[in-house]
Protein backbone atom coordinates (compact mmCIF):
# COMPACT_ATOMS: atom_id res chain seq x y z
CA UNK A 1 0.00 0.00 0.00
CA UNK A 2 2.38 2.67 1.16
CA UNK A 3 5.23 1.22 -0.89
CA UNK A 4 3.59 0.01 -4.11
CA UNK A 5 2.06 3.29 -5.26
CA UNK A 6 5.25 5.37 -5.08
CA UNK A 7 7.30 2.48 -6.52
CA UNK A 8 4.92 2.25 -9.48
CA UNK A 9 5.36 5.94 -10.29
CA UNK A 10 9.15 5.75 -9.96
CA UNK A 11 9.34 2.63 -12.15
CA UNK A 12 7.17 4.14 -14.83
CA UNK A 13 9.19 7.37 -14.82
CA UNK A 14 12.44 5.37 -15.02
CA UNK A 15 11.16 3.34 -17.96
CA UNK A 16 9.83 6.36 -19.85
CA UNK A 17 12.87 8.58 -19.26
CA UNK A 18 15.57 5.92 -19.42
CA UNK A 19 17.11 7.30 -16.21
CA UNK A 20 19.35 4.49 -14.86
CA UNK A 21 19.71 6.02 -11.38
CA UNK A 22 15.94 6.31 -10.97
CA UNK A 23 15.55 2.75 -12.27
CA UNK A 24 18.03 1.44 -9.69
CA UNK A 25 16.25 3.25 -6.86
CA UNK A 26 12.82 2.09 -8.01
CA UNK A 27 13.99 -1.51 -8.32
CA UNK A 28 15.46 -1.27 -4.82
CA UNK A 29 12.02 -0.23 -3.58
CA UNK A 30 10.59 -3.34 -5.24
CA UNK A 31 13.11 -5.54 -3.38
CA UNK A 32 11.92 -4.00 -0.13
CA UNK A 33 8.31 -4.86 -1.05
CA UNK A 34 9.20 -8.57 -1.07
CA UNK A 35 8.79 -8.73 2.72
CA UNK A 36 5.04 -8.12 2.44
CA UNK A 37 2.50 -10.91 1.98
CA UNK A 38 -0.87 -9.22 2.52
CA UNK A 39 -2.15 -6.25 0.52
CA UNK A 40 -2.72 -3.47 3.03
CA UNK A 41 -2.03 0.14 3.87
CA UNK A 42 -3.08 1.90 0.66
CA UNK A 43 -5.97 3.90 2.13
CA UNK A 44 -4.51 5.32 5.31
CA UNK A 45 -6.47 8.56 4.95
CA UNK A 46 -9.54 6.63 6.09
CA UNK A 47 -8.64 3.11 7.20
CA UNK A 48 -6.16 1.45 9.57
CA UNK A 49 -2.78 0.50 8.12
CA UNK A 50 -3.07 -3.21 8.96
CA UNK A 51 -6.32 -4.05 7.19
CA UNK A 52 -6.45 -5.99 3.91
CA UNK A 53 -7.01 -3.61 1.02
CA UNK A 54 -7.65 -4.24 -2.69
CA UNK A 55 -6.15 -0.89 -3.64
CA UNK A 56 -2.81 -2.14 -2.28
CA UNK A 57 -3.17 -5.34 -4.33
CA UNK A 58 -3.91 -3.38 -7.50
CA UNK A 59 -1.00 -1.02 -6.97
CA UNK A 60 1.37 -3.93 -6.30
CA UNK A 61 0.27 -5.76 -9.47
CA UNK A 62 0.84 -2.62 -11.51
CA UNK A 63 4.22 -1.90 -9.88
CA UNK A 64 5.52 -5.40 -10.51
CA UNK A 65 4.26 -5.35 -14.11
CA UNK A 66 6.09 -2.06 -14.59
CA UNK A 67 9.25 -3.60 -13.08
CA UNK A 68 8.87 -6.50 -15.51
CA UNK A 69 8.52 -4.09 -18.44
CA UNK A 70 11.64 -2.29 -17.30
CA UNK A 71 13.83 -5.36 -16.70
CA UNK A 72 12.23 -8.42 -18.29
CA UNK A 73 13.04 -10.36 -15.10
CA UNK A 74 10.59 -13.25 -14.57
CA UNK A 75 10.66 -12.76 -10.78
CA UNK A 76 8.79 -9.47 -11.19
CA UNK A 77 6.10 -11.22 -13.19
CA UNK A 78 5.81 -13.90 -10.49
CA UNK A 79 5.33 -11.19 -7.87
CA UNK A 80 2.70 -9.46 -10.03
CA UNK A 81 0.84 -12.75 -10.32
CA UNK A 82 1.02 -13.27 -6.54
CA UNK A 83 -0.47 -9.84 -5.84
CA UNK A 84 -3.18 -10.42 -8.45
CA UNK A 85 -4.23 -13.55 -6.56
CA UNK A 86 -4.38 -11.59 -3.28
CA UNK A 87 -6.97 -9.26 -4.80
CA UNK A 88 -9.45 -11.93 -5.90
CA UNK A 89 -11.09 -12.39 -2.45
CA UNK A 90 -12.29 -8.78 -2.69
CA UNK A 91 -14.27 -9.44 -5.90
CA UNK A 92 -17.85 -10.71 -5.72
CA UNK A 93 -17.81 -13.69 -8.09
CA UNK A 94 -21.50 -14.36 -7.53
CA UNK A 95 -24.72 -12.41 -7.28
CA UNK A 96 -27.84 -12.46 -5.21
CA UNK A 97 -31.22 -12.16 -6.88
CA UNK A 98 -32.43 -8.59 -6.66
CA UNK A 99 -28.92 -7.11 -6.47
CA UNK A 100 -27.96 -6.70 -10.14
CA UNK A 101 -24.77 -4.77 -9.39
CA UNK A 102 -23.28 -7.38 -7.08
CA UNK A 103 -21.56 -9.66 -9.59
CA UNK A 104 -17.94 -8.59 -10.20
CA UNK A 105 -18.28 -5.68 -7.80
CA UNK A 106 -15.35 -5.07 -5.48
CA UNK A 107 -15.04 -4.67 -1.73
CA UNK A 108 -12.37 -2.08 -0.90
CA UNK A 109 -11.20 -3.28 2.52
CA UNK A 110 -11.92 -6.08 4.96
CA UNK A 111 -12.41 -4.05 8.12
CA UNK A 112 -13.55 -0.65 9.26
CA UNK A 113 -12.86 3.02 8.84
CA UNK A 114 -11.60 5.71 11.17
CA UNK A 115 -15.07 7.23 11.00
CA UNK A 116 -18.53 5.90 11.90
CA UNK A 117 -19.20 2.85 9.77
CA UNK A 118 -17.79 -0.44 8.54
CA UNK A 119 -16.66 -1.04 4.98
CA UNK A 120 -17.12 -4.82 5.35
CA UNK A 121 -18.98 -6.12 2.33
CA UNK A 122 -19.53 -2.65 0.87
CA UNK A 123 -18.27 -2.09 -2.67
CA UNK A 124 -16.05 0.82 -3.65
CA UNK A 125 -15.91 0.93 -7.42
CA UNK A 126 -12.84 3.09 -7.94
CA UNK A 127 -10.67 0.76 -5.84
CA UNK A 128 -11.82 -2.14 -7.99
CA UNK A 129 -10.98 -0.25 -11.15
CA UNK A 130 -7.38 0.25 -9.96
CA UNK A 131 -7.17 -3.50 -9.38
CA UNK A 132 -8.74 -4.19 -12.80
CA UNK A 133 -6.14 -1.93 -14.43
CA UNK A 134 -3.43 -4.03 -12.78
CA UNK A 135 -5.04 -7.24 -14.04
CA UNK A 136 -5.08 -5.85 -17.58
CA UNK A 137 -1.37 -5.11 -17.25
CA UNK A 138 -0.72 -8.64 -16.01
CA UNK A 139 -2.82 -10.21 -18.77
CA UNK A 140 -0.36 -8.79 -21.32
CA UNK A 141 2.34 -11.08 -19.95
CA UNK A 142 0.61 -13.95 -18.14
CA UNK A 143 -2.03 -16.34 -19.38
CA UNK A 144 -2.03 -18.70 -16.38
CA UNK A 145 -5.44 -17.38 -15.30
CA UNK A 146 -8.14 -15.36 -17.13
CA UNK A 147 -6.96 -12.05 -15.64
CA UNK A 148 -8.43 -10.03 -18.50
CA UNK A 149 -11.84 -11.65 -18.01
CA UNK A 150 -11.84 -10.69 -14.33
CA UNK A 151 -10.76 -7.14 -15.22
CA UNK A 152 -13.53 -6.84 -17.81
CA UNK A 153 -16.07 -8.15 -15.29
CA UNK A 154 -15.07 -5.46 -12.79
CA UNK A 155 -15.35 -2.81 -15.51
CA UNK A 156 -18.79 -4.08 -16.56
CA UNK A 157 -19.91 -3.98 -12.93
CA UNK A 158 -18.77 -0.36 -12.70
CA UNK A 159 -20.65 0.47 -15.90
CA UNK A 160 -23.85 -1.17 -14.59
CA UNK A 161 -23.67 1.09 -11.53
CA UNK A 162 -23.81 4.30 -13.53
CA UNK A 163 -27.12 6.06 -13.96
CA UNK A 164 -28.03 6.71 -17.56
CA UNK A 165 -31.26 8.53 -16.76
CA UNK A 166 -33.45 9.48 -13.84
CA UNK A 167 -32.38 10.55 -10.37
CA UNK A 168 -29.26 9.10 -8.87
Residue ranges and their predicted role:
Residues 1-168:
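Glycan-recognition and catalytic cores of secretory/periplasmic carbohydrate-active enzymes
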Amino acid sequence: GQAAGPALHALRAARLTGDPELAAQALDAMKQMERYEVPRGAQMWECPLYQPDILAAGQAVRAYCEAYRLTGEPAHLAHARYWAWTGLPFVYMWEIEGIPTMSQNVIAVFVSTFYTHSWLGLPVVWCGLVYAYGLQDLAEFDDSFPWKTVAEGILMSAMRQQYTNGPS
